[in-house]
Amino acid sequence: AILGQDGSVWAQGLHLGGAKYVIAGEPGAVIRLGDYLLDQGL
């Protein structure tokens, strides 16, 4: 995963604009998009 300067986490396999956010190879990763915290289970 790539950690952004604002603390956001971007991982390979992330799909924006859909209902599903998939993190490939990052079992414990959390994605922060704006005010949303999305874990791998969403």
UniProtKB/Swiss-Prot annotation:
Q: Which GO terms describe its molecular function?
A: actin binding
Record carries keyword Cell membrane: no
| Annotated localization | Cytoplasm, Cytoskeleton
The answer, when asked if Cytoplasm is one of the entry's keywords, is: yes
Q: Which superkingdom heads the taxonomic lineage of this protein's source?
A: Eukaryota
Query: Which UniProt keyword terms apply here?
Result: Actin-binding, Allergen, Cytoplasm, Cytoskeleton
Please provide, in alphabetical order, the Gene Ontology terms of the cellular component aspect for this entry: cytoplasm; cytoskeleton
**Self-association and partners:** Occurs in many kinds of cells as a complex with monomeric actin in a 1:1 ratio.
Q: Which family does it belong to?
A: Belongs to the profilin family.
Task: Report the protein's function.
Answer: Binds to actin and affects the structure of the cytoskeleton. At high concentrations, profilin prevents the polymerization of actin, whereas it enhances it at low concentrations.
Query: What is the name listed in the Swiss-Prot or TrEMBL entry for this protein?
Result: Profilin
Query: Taxonomic lineage per UniProt?
Result: Eukaryota, Viridiplantae, Streptophyta, Embryophyta, Tracheophyta
